[in-house]
Amino acid sequence: SIDKINELKYTTSMANCRGCTNNCRLTINKFSGGRQYVSGNRCERGIGKEKNKDHIPNLYEYKYKRIFSYTPLTADKASRGKVGIPRVLNMFENYPFWYTFFTELKYEVVLSPTSTRKIYELGIESIPSESECYPAKLAHGHVTWLIRNGVKFIFYPCIPYERNEFPDAVNHYNCPIVTSYAENIKNNVDELNDPSITFRNPFLAFTSEEILANRLVEDCLLYTSPSPRDRSVS
C-alpha cells in the first residue's frame, strides 16, 4: 500500500566483494524488514548466491598425469631392453606417442622424473648459455639423470613440425628451442661421449605418418623389422 511505501526506510553502504580477485565494488541497500539489494557485482558471488568452490578440478594437474601416467613394460617383457626419454619440452605433448611406439617395440620406457631444483643442478655444468629459457636448461639435468641411472639408449627427437590440429591453422611449427635442442644436448653433455651410451635425436615431423615411420627406421631403429614399426606408429 501507499502507507507502507511511505514508511519504507533503507540505508546504503559500500563494500568490496572478496569472492575473487576482481574485488568488485558493491553498493548494499538494506531495507526495513530485513531485505537488501546489492548492485555493482559481476556475478552471483557478490550477492551471496554462489560460494567459492573448493572442488574445481585442476586441469593442469589432470593433463600432466594423463600424459605421463603410463606403466612401462617389466624387464621380463621388454625384450629389447630400456629406452630413456627425458621429461622435457616437446615431450609434454608427445610422450604418449613415444611411450606407445617403444612399448609396441618391446622396450621398457624409462622416463626421467618431475623437474626439481636437484634435476636442474644435475645438468648445470653442461648448459652453454645463460640466455636459454629455463625449460631448455632443465633438459640437461633430465638427460644426465637418465645417464646416471644406467640407461644406455636415450631417445630425444628434434621436432620441427607438430601434428596439425586445426585445418585452418596458419602453421604448426615449434619454436627454435623445441625444434633442435637435442642437438645442443648432444654437443654439450660430455657423458654422452661414452661409447656404451646411444643417444638418438633424429629430426622428425608429425605431418605424415608414413614419412615419420620411414625416418624412425632410417635414423634410429634400423634393427627393427618394418611390421612392428609400422604398427607402433599407426
Q: Could you describe each region identified by the protein language model?
A:
Residues 164-219:
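Glycine-rich, acidic loop regions that bind phosphate or pyrophosphate groups
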